[in-house]
Curated annotation (Swiss-Prot):
Catalytic activity: hexadecanoate + ATP + CoA = hexadecanoyl-CoA + AMP + diphosphate; (9Z)-octadecenoate + ATP + CoA = (9Z)-octadecenoyl-CoA + AMP + diphosphate; octadecanoate + ATP + CoA = octadecanoyl-CoA + AMP + diphosphate; tetradecanoate + ATP + CoA = tetradecanoyl-CoA + AMP + diphosphate
Lineage start: Eukaryota, Viridiplantae, Streptophyta, Embryophyta, Tracheophyta
Region spans: SBD2: 339-403
A cellular component annotation (GO) from this entry: peroxisome
Gene name, Swiss-Prot/TrEMBL: 4CLL7
Organism: Arabidopsis thaliana
Protein name per the record: 4-coumarate--CoA ligase-like 7
Pfam families referenced in this protein's UniProt entry, alphabetically: AMP-binding, AMP-binding_C
Amino acid sequence: MEKSGYGRDGIYRSLRPTLVLPKDPNTSLVSFLFRNSSSYPSKLAIADSDTGDSLTFSQLKSAVARLAHGFHRLGIRKNDVVLIFAPNSYQFPLCFLAVTAIGGVFTTANPLYTVNEVSKQIKDSNPKIIISVNQLFDKIKGFDLPVVLLGSKDTVEIPPGSNSKILSFDNVMELSEPVSEYPFVEIKQSDTAALLYSSGTTGTSKGVELTHGNFIAASLMVTMDQDLMGEYHGVFLCFLPMFHVFGLAVITYSQLQRGNALVSMARFELELVLKNIEKFRVTHLWVVPPVFLALSKQSIVKKFDLSSLKYIGSGAAPLGKDLMEECGRNIPNVLLMQGYGMTETCGIVSVEDPRLGKRNSGSAGMLAPGVEAQIVSVETGKSQPPNQQGEIWVRGPNMMKGYLNNPQATKETIDKKSWVHTGDLGYFNEDGNLYVVDRIKELIKYKGFQVAPAELEGLLVSHPDILDAVVIPFPDEEAGEVPIAFVVRSPNSSITEQDIQKFIAKQVAPYKRLRRVSFISLVPKSAAGKILRRELVQQVRSKM
């Protein structure tokens, strides 16, 4: 095997130590989370920055057991689906753990969804109960399903004239006496624990079935570097939505099972994030590119004491080297890292190794322990050696079971040898670092050349007068497609289209040059921070 991890069989293997998974097939993600908690019972587990509530690991374990009995009394049985439609709070992970402790399947929906969008997900996942909040009740009252409203007794208002199927979170807790054990349900690692809907960048949203074993494996992959560095009792701020795999698996579950503390935030607001880092002495911050941009470019960052912060990690979309260096200047003494994962891989494929120190290379790091990969040529279907691009295929114990009710999509994504075809274009360098170039379907085809929008976007946001940017294809009779950009100017900037075109032309081959630049106030993005290029493509084409 080369130092890149590339083998003679065309497979890249992780350069990290071997992943050790629990051997007992009857291990649930909940029993695994609390396996060591008796040695730190009074340590902070969860703090809710919005309400001031907090729980130690001992209190968390008791609350989850009691809530599990409550859901059991409400009739939730093994394989029953429970939908949560709510923003982050300390009660969100309690519900996740309580539902999965009794063999239920936890599915999540974006609080920004319309009635129509929630309706589609309810039709697909068939939940028995909806967990939500007062503010969103109007969107779910028409589904004729029992509802549990999160919040405290004082803040939950049971809407007048509504049916008797509405309970508060406290009501569910009170259905059971304080208990120390969960209702007995036999749970296997291969059982489905969560049904998370993929962002649908390739079309309609699909329900990704993730097992107890997937969560356990992914959590060990995510936290192995902490073991290697001898780091304990970190404090992780979670404003990334817990309805998404990044917030739920990579931050919430992975860190709690490691004995780290979690600080929840209901929504992202830069000043509030900075205040909470200072207040809770946060050590680790996982973000998505729009937040990374804000941390790089906003002067308000300098007004807060961020001395506790050791790491900022970013995922969801590739970040360029220039932007990482800019962020490093704005927040010195913090290690900046990137990772790569997707819902289908329980949030992790690769992550940079903090033991290597500051690099800001623009890479998504080395394969997580236990993960194998291939880079497969889009033209020939053959495995590619280092520094050759192709589609990223991955395999490992963190890969999904499949898509719910969609055998065709499952078959198209997972092949007979268990490789998950990611649809992402990338390559490994000679040191085994993965570089994610872009989504294959989003590449711009210019006279047979391929132009990656993410590469041009990375160059654009490296300019001090540019706050954000998106690049999309524009139909062209001669070339097929040409790259055009939509740019958000920095405050007080008067940068012009010509200035931007010249700035890019100096740095790229002629076929990658921008043919047009338009100015917009906001780049459309998903809750996970991914650019919604399709929306802009559709807008542009509808005006042609």
